[in-house]
Amino acid sequence: MANILILGAGAMGTAFSFPCSDKGHSVTIIGTHLENNFIDQINLTRVHPILECEVPKKVIFLKLEQLAEQINSKGKIDLIVVAVISKGIEWASTELGKALKNEIPILILTKGLAINDNNYEVLAHKMERLMKKNGIKETNISAAGGPCLAKGLANKIHTSVVFANTNITVAKQISKLVTTDYYHVFTSDDVVGVETCAAIKNIFSMAIGASQGLCHPST
C-alpha cells in the first residue's frame, strides 16, 4: 500500500482517487486555497458536486493549511499528484516548494502549455524550473496524457493514458501503483511529446469533427 497525496479537489483530482483507492492505497486530497467551502461540502455529504457521485469512503479531504503537515509529518508520502488548472501550476509549484523537505515523485494531471522567454514550455518543465527557484534542488516530475474524462474515470469507464518521465523506470513504478482493470496506463520517456499531444489534441479533434460535419446539411 502506498500513501498518495493529491493537490486539487476538483473533478480530475477526485476522479483520480478512484483507481488509487481501488488499488488499496491511502489517499489524501488537499484542496486549493479556493476550495475550502468545496471541501466542507464533500466532507458533509461524501458526494462530489461536479462528478455527481459518492467519493471512495477511505479518501480523506483536507484543506490547504494542512499540506505541509501531511507531506512531512504524517508518515512517508510515496506520490504527490498535481490536479489543478493550468493557470494554477505556478501556485502549486510555490506551495509544494514551501512544503517539501525531501524529494517525492510528482505526477502532473494538468494539461496545457506555458510560455517562457517567448518559447513554449511543457508544464513538467515549468514546475521543475519554478520549484528550483523555491529552493527544491532535486525534482522528479512525471506528466500524464490521454483522452481521460473525469466523470468517465469516476464511473470506472475504460480509459487509457500515458505517464511520461525522462526516467522511464519512475514512470513504470507510478503506473504500477494506479493501473486497474479500467484505468490502463502506458509509459514513455518522451515528456515533451506526451505533454504537447495532450495539450493540443482537442484542436485536432475539433478540426476533424468540423470537416466531417461539412458533409452533412446544417441543422
What are these regions (language model features)?
Residues A9, G13, E35, I89, ...:
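Generic structural signal for well-ordered, non-membrane alpha-helical segments
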Residues M1-E54, V59-Q66, N116:
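NAD(P)+-binding Rossmann beta1-loop-alpha1 motif at the extreme N-terminus of oxidoreductases
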Residues F61-L62, Q66, K74-I157, I174:
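Rossmann-like NAD(P)(H) cofactor-binding subdomain of soluble oxidoreductases
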Residues A99, L130-N140, H158-T219:
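Internal alpha-helical scaffold of NAD(P)-dependent oxidoreductase catalytic cores
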Residues A11, C20-S21, R46, I50, ...:
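Structural signal for hydrophobic packing residues in well-ordered secondary-structure cores
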Residues H33, A83-V84, N165:
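Conserved residues at beta->alpha junctions
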